[in-house]
Amino acid sequence: MAARSWQDELAQQAEEGSARLRELLSVGLGFLRTELGLDLGLEPKRYPGWVILVGTGALGLLLLFLLGYGWAAACAGARKKRRSPPRKREEAAPPTPAPDDLAQLKNLRSEEQKKKNRKKLPEKPKPNGRTVEVPEDEVVRNPRSITAKQAPETDKKNEKSKKNKKKSKSDAKAVQNSSRHDGKEVDEGAWETKISHREKRQQRKRDKVLTDSGSLDSTIPGIENIITVTTEQLTTASFPVGSKKNKGDSHLNVQVSNFKSGKGDSTLQVSSRLNENLTVNGGGWSEKSVKLSSQLSEEKWNSVPPASAGKRKTEPSAWTQDTGDTNANGKDWGRNWSDRSIFSGIGSTAEPVSQSTTSDYQWDVSRNQPYIDDEWSGLNGLSSADPSSDWNAPAEEWGNWVDEDRASLLKSQEPISNDQKVSDDDKEKGEGALPTGKSKKKKKKKKKQGEDNSHTQDTEDLEKDTREELPVNTSKARPKQEKACSLKTMSTSDPAEVLIKNSQPVKTLPPAISAEPSITLSKGDSDNSSSQVPPMLQDTDKPKSNAKQNSVPPSQTKSETNWESPKQIKKKKKARRET
């Protein structure tokens, strides 16, 4: 029922609309007949309602289409009019202007043509068939001809510059290709060596150091190899310097450049001083084997810690700190004073070594020989002790053992300073008797003897190293220690004849320098050395082992005896000046 009712309502509305349309059509056809006399022969009452509806709808669409098309055409025409207004003005312009307006027209058109020429050069003005515009064409042609002439000239210049650039680039490429051939540069012309700013700065620093001071410092740290300077290297003007600035390298450059004008003996002097500093204060003690040059026989162990020299006070001439000054820090006194530097005494190796260097030396020795303490200690080495001695190692640790050790050290400092004064007086006496140079034959003989007795020399080195670490508590052990000192100094100092003159009577003297003294010993050598060491020395070593058991480092007890008074230093300097 709902569907039928909806369709019925539609049909009713369509019939009503068609009835109205019929009325309108009939009215329109009657109007055409009466007014215009047109008879179309249409009778709207005969056609059904749906035909009238469809016809009217089609006519309405057609009218809408026509209206839209007309509107679009009108809009397009309006746009075209907006785009081209000057053409209409030219078309609407009067064909024959009056003669009064010619001047104004000329001015206006000349301005317009100038503007056009600026904007569009290739366009030609339109004369419009006028005879008056002839001079204007001439005026316009002149700037065009000028610009046309200028344009080809600039083009030619640009082409030439481009060609030149191309040629230069091609030449540069050819040169680069030839230089890159096989990765080798072509050797043509004179090569110039360019010095960088960094090298110039380093050279200025070297020159400044040469003018300010002319002597080496007492120690050259960081160098472990023996340096020998030949006469050819000394005569050269400059030495190659690496990129890194090492302290030792700068000292070497200073020392070598000071002896540029020297002779052959100056080369011996430089090499011997360098060898001495390296073997005494450098890192050479930590190496297993140190090769000494033949020039070391003339040099002395003059930079030994002063405390160790003070222990051997009964025989001051046997320990060769005094003989180390005979050559005055390794200097050759046969040279002229003009060849020397004025302030050569500053920073020399004969001055007392600071506590830091001696402590480092002691720690190096103890680090390389850890088994000596176990062998010489009282608790572990009872079998190696002297059976004739009265002393025995305590079974328990004493609480006040370290304090007694320090008190004995403080008491032993007072006689040491007096004995060092006596050694300085003997030093002045012995300096005049020693000769300045030795022959090569004696050196060779000493080398041969030293090779035969290298084993005894190793044991003596061991004795000296351990004796420097241990404090002296009793006066009974001093004579035997002094004998051991004399044996040690004979191995590293001048020939035996000089030492016999300066020392108190010693029965046996072992031969001098060993060619290659080894610092670190094997276990077999350490066993042999323990049997060859004097018994009293072993006795004095036992308190030291107990002190180590009480966790007291050796540097604390040793550093107290390393200090020297300024009076002793002044006396040593006076002795050097007098010689």
UniProtKB/Swiss-Prot annotation:
Region described as Activation of NF-kappa-B: spans on this chain: 1-71
User: What membrane topology is annotated for this entry?
Assistant: Single-pass membrane protein
Complex and partners: Interacts with BCCIP, CREBBP/CBP and RELA/p65.
Tissues with expression? In the mammary gland, expressed at the apical surface of epithelial cells lining ducts, as well as in the mammary fat pad. Not detected in the spleen, kidney, lung, or skin; minute amounts seen in the liver. Expressed in Purkinje neurons in the early postnatal and adult cerebellum. Overexpressed in mammary tumors (at protein level).
Where is the sequence biased in composition, kind Basic residues? 159-168, 197-207, 438-448, 568-579
Specify where the region named Lung-homing for mammary tumors lies, as residue ranges: 378-440
Q: Which GO terms describe its molecular function?
A: double-stranded RNA binding; NF-kappaB binding; transcription coactivator activity
Q: Which residues carry this modification: N6-acetyllysine?
A: K263
UniProt keywords, alphabetically: Acetylation, Cell junction, Cytoplasm, Endoplasmic reticulum, Membrane, Nucleus, Phosphoprotein, Tight junction, Transmembrane, Transmembrane helix
Region (Disordered) residue ranges read: 78-222, 277-579
Q: Which residues carry this modification: Phosphoserine?
A: 179, 215, 250, 297, 303, 308, 341, 366, 412, 423, 454, 475, 491, 493, 565
Per UniProt, the ranges with Basic and acidic residues bias are: 108-126, 421-431, 449-470
Q: Where is this region: Interaction with BCCIP?
A: 72-168
CC annotations in GO:
bicellular tight junction; endoplasmic reticulum; endoplasmic reticulum membrane; fibrillar center; nuclear body; nuclear membrane; nucleolus; perinuclear region of cytoplasm
User: Where is the signal peptide, in residue numbers?
Assistant: none
Q: Specify where it is mainly localized.
A: endoplasmic reticulum
Q: Annotated region Interaction with RELA: where?
A: 100-204
One Pfam family of this chain? LYRIC
Spell out the subcellular localization from the entry: Endoplasmic reticulum membrane; Nucleus membrane; Cell junction, Tight junction; Nucleus, Nucleolus
Q: What does this protein do?
A: Down-regulates SLC1A2/EAAT2 promoter activity when expressed ectopically. Activates the nuclear factor kappa-B (NF-kappa-B) transcription factor. Promotes anchorage-independent growth of immortalized melanocytes and astrocytes which is a key component in tumor cell expansion. Promotes lung metastasis and also has an effect on bone and brain metastasis, possibly by enhancing the seeding of tumor cells to the target organ endothelium. Induces chemoresistance.
Task: Tell me where the transmembrane regions lie.
Answer: 49-69
- Organism of origin: Mus musculus
| One biological process term in Gene Ontology | positive regulation of angiogenesis
Name-wise, this protein is Protein LYRIC
